[in-house]
Amino acid sequence: MSPSPISYESGIGRRDFFCSGGSAILGSLVAALLGGAKPARAQTISGNVPEVDRATVRVVTDNYHFALSPSGKIGDVEVGRVGFPLSDQPPERVLLSEFGLSMHLETQRGNETRNVLIDFGYSSPTLLNNIDILGIDPAKLDAMVLSHGHYDHFGGMVGFLRATQGKRKPKLPLYIGGEECFCSRQFTAGPTPLNFGALDRKAIAEADLVVTTAEGPAVIADHAFVTGHIPRATFERVLSPTRMKVGIDNGLGCFPDKMPPDRRPIDWAPDEFDHEISTCVNVKGRGLLVMTSCGHRGVVNAVKQAMAVSGLQKVHAVLGGFHLAPHNEDYVRQTIKGLVDLDVDHIVPMHCTGEPFYEILKAELPKKVIRSYTGTKLVFGA
């Protein structure tokens, strides 16, 4: 069953993905890149967020894989591991890992099943290899979400779209947090700024996707929701490893007139990640799952936004990248306290979280932390 028709209520700000009006040159560029398609509008949340009976999160791509890690049950969470893909023939392939993140979400409610791909990792060979080994069928996807415009989360997208052309459902929704997602970026953590890429608008247009902006909270495939913009409401601060450029260069980048007025005149500026979104699920009898992907806006901020959007106070699990690797121990401990104060049942750090966070949590709150690797399957609910 396909996602519900997309609608958009007033009251939640929107910057159209597609450009309308403007100069003849800009209009021609938009038509060439986007095929003249109409803007897509996210189905906003009115009333209660969806509730599901069961949610399964599969880590498609993460930083590393430990083939000997055992499966089992941690608290009320079923944890499945993938070792070697053995058969009656010698194993020719294994799961690949890289500094990137991609997750697959499958939810059940009664007889309904929904499948969502969240982020695309760093490279398409890794993504395609792992999807095949893990048995994830692109034809079953009901939606895709791109959490933010960093290459280690969208780098595998174009190759994935081309490899699965004609195999996916037509007009598959791709949710993003806004036009800023398309801005060109440079990596600035080293001595010299280096190219960190930009989303390929032409490839996305050719893939027959419905690119859907969700600057506010939005329902995903009837079963899940995204937070929309994540306010900075706690001690957490953005420590950006990149800077972004507003403008179009050789068909890549973000349209200035689709950016907030205070961002339009910017050449290069530090990322504030106003476009970053988290994907969430309300599991019956358990509470919220919050998938932060990279957590540039702060993992505690993301959880608080999910709670505010849903009206739910119970947080069952927080999983994804928390972007704590660049921070010192005091900040890491403050983040742990913030999650403990929210009474989170399970914490599953991935990707850019860093080892200090895991080691402290494992030593002090071992029943809360779950170690995750590429291929790990986490089952929440009945």
Which residue stretches match the model-derived regions?
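Active-site-proximal beta-strand elements of phosphoester/diester hydrolases
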Residues: 56-60, 116-119, 224-230, 288-294
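Pre-active-site segment of Zn-dependent metallo-hydrolases
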Residues: 91-99, 107-143, 158-159, 166, ...
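Zn-dependent metallo-beta-lactamase
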Residues: 10, 20-35, 39-112, 226-275, ...
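Cap/insert and terminal regions of metallo-dependent hydrolase folds
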Residues: 143, 150-154, 173, 258-376
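Active-site HxH/HxHxD metal-binding segment of metal-dependent hydrolases
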Residues: 142-215, 228-239, 340-346
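N-terminal secretory signal peptides
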Residues: 1-13
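Active-site metal-binding loops of divalent metal-dependent hydrolases
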Residues: 62-63, 120-122, 149, 179-180, ...
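Divalent metal-coordination and catalytic microenvironments
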Residues: 105, 119, 131, 148, ...
